[in-house]
From Swiss-Prot:
Pathway: Purine metabolism; IMP biosynthesis via de novo pathway; 5-amino-1-(5-phospho-D-ribosyl)imidazole-4-carboxamide from 5-amino-1-(5-phospho-D-ribosyl)imidazole-4-carboxylate: step 1/2. This is Phosphoribosylaminoimidazole-succinocarboxamide synthase. It catalyses: 5-amino-1-(5-phospho-D-ribosyl)imidazole-4-carboxylate + L-aspartate + ATP = (2S)-2-[5-amino-1-(5-phospho-beta-D-ribosyl)imidazole-4-carboxamido]succinate + ADP + phosphate + 2 H(+). One of its GO terms (molecular function) is ATP binding. Its EC number is 6.3.2.6. Transmembrane segments: none annotated. The keyword RNA-binding does not apply.
C-alpha cells in the first residue's frame, strides 16, 4: 500500500446518514446526524445531554493547512501521515486533564476511532481565544515595527524576540467575518480588544456580559493546566488558540464549554525547553512547517500578505512540496503526541474503511 493511500486526505465523502450537507473545514468535516439518530444514540449510549440534543460526527483528516491554504507533496501525497490521529489524541488527553482539574467540559461525547469524535452541537463564541506566554509570531512582527498596543494591551519597551512576556496575555481575534460591529473591520482573524467584546458581547455570541469573565477564566485555567503538563515533559507552551461555545445540559440550562481542539501543534506553538535555554528555538508545532514554506518559496510576501491571496492559493495548488517536508512534520507531530500522551500513536493503514466499519457496526450510522 502506498503512502498516499494511508493518508486520509478527503474526509467529507463518508456514507454517514445526515440531515443536512456535510460541513467541510480546512482539516475537519462535520456530519450533522438526523434527529432520530441523535435521540437513538443519546439513549443507547447514555450520553449526558438533553434527550433532544443535536449530535454530529466530526472526522479529522491528515490535511496540512498553513497560511490559509492546503498543501500537498510529490507522489500524490495530500496530507501528513499520522497527523489527524496525533491531533485528536493530544486534544483527548488535554480534555481528560481539564476534567480531572474540574474545568469546563468539551463538546466531545464519544471517540469511536482515532480520527472520529461524536460531539454535541454547540453555539460558538465568535472569538479566536488566543493566549500568549512569549512574544513571537504576529505580536513580535507588530512590536518590531514599533507598535506598542496589541489587542488593546500596552506592551512595555525593551522586549526581545521570543522572550517570555511579563505576564500571560489574552489577545483575541474575530472568528470568521463579523459585520456591523463598530471599530471592528469586516475581515477574518482581526485583532480585537476586551473593550470591543464588552461593548458588543451579543454580536460575539455571548449570552451575558459576565460570561466574558467566565471565558477568560476558562482560557487562563486551560492554558495553565497544559503549560504545567508540558513543562514536565521538557516543553514550553508558547501560545495557543482556544474556542468556546454554549451547549444545553440535561436540564436544558446553557453552559460554556471548550470546543474544537486544544493544545495541539496545529493550534499552538510548543518549544523544546532545553534548546530554548541554550538560545535555540526548536518548534514542536506547525510553526516549523510555516517557516519551511517561508524559506522554500523565493517571495515569502505572498504567504504573509493577505492582499495576495489569489497568488497564494495558486502557489499551494500548483506546487507539490518535497515529500520530506511532510514527513518531517509527521515526525514532529507523532513525537510531541507521544511525549504528551505517554503512548505511541497507532497509524491506520486504511482509515476510511475502518471508520465506516465502526460507525456501521457499533453506531448504525452508515447509509446503505
Amino acid at each position: 500500500m502506498s503512502l498516499a493511500d494511508q493518508v486520509l486526505a478527503v474526509n467529507d465523502d463518508l456514507p454517514i446518514r445526515t440531515h443536512q450537507p456535510v460541513h467541510s473545514g480546512k482539516v475537519r468535516s462535520v456530519y450533522w446526524l438526523t434527529e432520530q439518530d441523535s435521540r437513538r444514540l443519546i439513549k443507547e449510549k447514555g450520553y449526558p445531554v438533553a434527550e433532544d440534543a443535536p449530535l454530529a460526527i466530526m472526522v479529522i483528516s491528515d490535511r496540512i493547512s498553513a497560511f490559509d491554504c492546503i498543501w500537498h507533496a510529490e507522489g500524490g501525497v495530500h496530507g501528513v501521515p499520522g497527523k489527524g490521529a496525533a491531533l485528536n489524541a493530544i486534544s483527548n488527553h488535554w480534555f481528560k486533564l481539564f476534567k480531572q482539574h474540574g474545568l469546563a467540559e468539551s463538546h466531545i461525547l464519544d471517540i469511536p476511532h482515532p480520527f472520529v469524535w461524536i460531539v454535541q452541537k454547540a453555539r460558538p463564541i465568535k472569538i479566536e481565544a488566543i493566549c500568549r506566554q512569549y512574544i513571537t509570531g504576529s505580536m513580535w512582527r507588530a512590536y518590531a515595527k514599533g507598535e506598542r498596543e496589541f489587542c488593546g494591551i500596552t506592551l512595555p519597551e525593551g522586549l526581545e524576540k521570543d522572550s517570555q512576556l511579563p505576564e500571560l496575555l489574552m489577545t483575541p481575534s474575530t472568528k470568521g467575518i463579523l459585520r456591523g460591529i463598530p471599530g471592528v473591520p469586516e475581515a477574518d482573524d482581526v485583532n480585537i480588544s476586551r473593550q470591543d467584546i464588552e461593548a458588543n458581547y451579543a454580536a460575539f455570541n455571548f449570552n451575558q456580559p459576565q460570561d466574558i469573565d467566565h471565558y477568560e477564566t476558562l482560557l487562563k485555567q486551560g492554558f495553565a493546566v497544559i503549560s504545567e503538563a508540558l513543562k514536565s515533559v521538557g516543553q514550553l507552551f508558547v501560545d495557543t488558540k482556544f474556542e468556546f461555545g454554549y451547549v444545553a445540559d440535561q436540564q436544558g440550562q446553557q453552559k460554556l464549554i471548550y470546543m474544537d481542539e486544544v493544545g495541539t501543534p496545529d493550534s499552538s506553538r510548543i518549544w523544546d525547553a532545553q534548546q530554548y535555554q541554550q538560545g535555540k528555538i526548536v518548534e514542536n508545532s506547525k510553526e516549523g512547517f510555516r517557516q519551511f514554506l517561508l524559506n522554500y518559496f523565493p517571495d515569502p510576501d505572498i504567504l504573509l500578505n493577505k492582499d495576495r491571496m489569489p497568488e497564494r492559493e495558486a502557489l499551494a495548488r500548483d506546487n507539490a512540496l518535497p515529500l520530506e517536508a511532510l514527513m518531517d512534520i509527521s515526525r514532529t507531530y507523532l513525537g510531541i503526541a507521544e511525549k504528551i500522551t505517554g503512548q505511541p500513536i497507532h497509524l491506520s493503514h486504511q482509515p476510511k474503511q475502518e471508520i465506516i466499519a465502526i460507525l456501521d457496526k457499533e453506531y448504525g450510522l452508515i447509509e446503505r
